[in-house]
């Protein structure tokens, strides 16, 4: 699996760059699927279809992934107090039940401790040529994106213990 992932990422850098960013084509993943696990987040093709109000498209895409990856597909949910998380979780639960796809917990970590949030925001502003004080700058991150302990994650998903169990199993 790891070798396939490195090949896919390398192909993205060599053959798939758009405006200096590597773009990975879906069929490259399908071609190198052996040993690879798929996690559907809100940014995945399935997640985007779910959030844009196209459940039939989401169902169809999920079935395509399941055809190739079988029991190596999961929904990955997070609770970082950001836009659309609750909607995605609701839809992931629906699809998990309908298609027997396990749900795991993740945290989209961007910094080590909660205290590092402001420094992270400063780095983002520098990278985007913005200033922290600008009230109109995008706020794409939250202070919840620090590396949480197992106890913190268990507490965060205490209403969904199966999600924690699935995460540990994975």
Question: Where do the PLM segments sit?
Answer:
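Phosphodiester-processing cores and adjacent nucleic acid-binding clamps
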Residues: 1-170
């Amino acid at each position: 699996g790891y070798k396939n992932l490195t090949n896919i990422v390398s192909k993205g850098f060599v053959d798939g760059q758009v405006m200096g960013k590597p773009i990975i084509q879906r069929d490259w993943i399908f071609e190198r699927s052996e040993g690879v696990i798929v996690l559907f987040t809100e940014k995945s093709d399935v997640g985007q279809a779910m959030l844009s109000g196209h459940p039939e498209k989401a169902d169809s895409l999920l079935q395509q992934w399941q055809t190739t990856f079988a029991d190596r597909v999961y929904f990955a949910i997070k609770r970082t107090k950001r836009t659309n998380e609750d909607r995605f979780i609701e839809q992931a639960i629906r699809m998990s039940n309908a298609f027997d796809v396990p749900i795991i917990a993740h945290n989209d970590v961007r910094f080590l401790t909660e205290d590092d949030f402001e420094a992270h925001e400063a780095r983002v502003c520098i990278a985007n040529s913005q200033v922290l004080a600008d009230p109109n700058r995008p706020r794409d991150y939250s202070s919840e994106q620090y590396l949480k302990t197992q106890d913190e994650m268990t507490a965060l998903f205490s209403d969904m213990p199966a999600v924690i169990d699935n995460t540990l199993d994975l």
